[in-house]
């Protein structure tokens, strides 16, 4: 836990050299490092000077790179968003750099009044830091905010030497301005990070990478960027019109309305029949990659979910829950045309297509038509002699695993044969 005095940054400062009358010697530097690392209070003179000026900056004047690590803070980093610092600096601070002298003025909340280049990018009372060395780790845990930046191995060292680091209080107070600049937010590259305190730099490893691969990043804490209030709220702004009203995206085929264009895009394959994600084992196609990933589980041998009544095992718990409906006789999906009931919604939808008489998926070889595209996919195996599911008892091949199981139940109604047939078919697939 950090000391009670909020640590805003550690930096080199020529003005402090002038006040002390001489450049700090290595011995005094080592003393300062030991004092900070041991979390003891500052010398009385330094503390009195800080109280008189109302500053929070600890100055370490040395020509060598600052190797003082950040102490582990008891901050909840669950809602921290990562933001590329170099992009932020290019947008807000290019051509508006403050000097080292300006950094040491008592009223340097905005560097100086004469430094008009920054304008309203920062607010009075907010520290704007100009780093003096490349290998410098900065932290500003003050008033519930935390910013961290590490210049080590930065790809923008020449520019970042004259860059600025600022507290997230600036961004929090300018929420509307930030929302107006998508480059500033960089939400398309933002990630929510959950970093444990042990990943912060330690005395043994001053520049320990606390965010792997993200040295050129700022960890920015903001209540406006939490997953609930910020990221979702920002995504809503992209789907709102200029007057603030939410946009509606309507499907031109069926008239279904969506609140985001992305959802409309996911919906369109329902009408086009496109199933670009195809299982390499059985050839079944899917509209979404996530559905294909869930489907692949059925081809594995792991079936941890077992039915307590019949002992049948399943890959997923949701499949087991659907299976339990069979024992309970529960068929919640009833066809409004013939009254036939179904345990699963998918089977119900497939059955309804038989009443419509529409078979839009036709085989290019034999012109046989099907209600659904995956039935056509399985049918194509009959033309290329591809039958990935083989019975382990008689060696007969099938295009679908369902047909193999039905064959085993009818002709080889034996539990051992069923187990052997499944194992054999899986071995043939792999």
Curated annotation (Swiss-Prot):
* Tissue-wise expression: No expression seen in DA or 5HT neurons.
Q: Where in the cell?
A: Nucleus
* One Pfam family recorded for the sequence: zf-C2H2_6
Q: What's in the keyword line of the UniProt record?
A: Developmental protein, Differentiation, DNA-binding, Metal-binding, Neurogenesis, Nucleus, Repeat, Repressor, Transcription, Transcription regulation, Zinc, Zinc-finger
C2H2-type Zn finger ranges: 249-271, 277-299, 305-327, 333-355, 361-383, 389-412
Q: Name one GO molecular function term.
A: zinc ion binding
Stated family: Belongs to the krueppel C2H2-type zinc-finger protein family.
Query: What name has this protein been given in UniProt?
Result: Fez family zinc finger protein 2
Name of the gene: fezf2
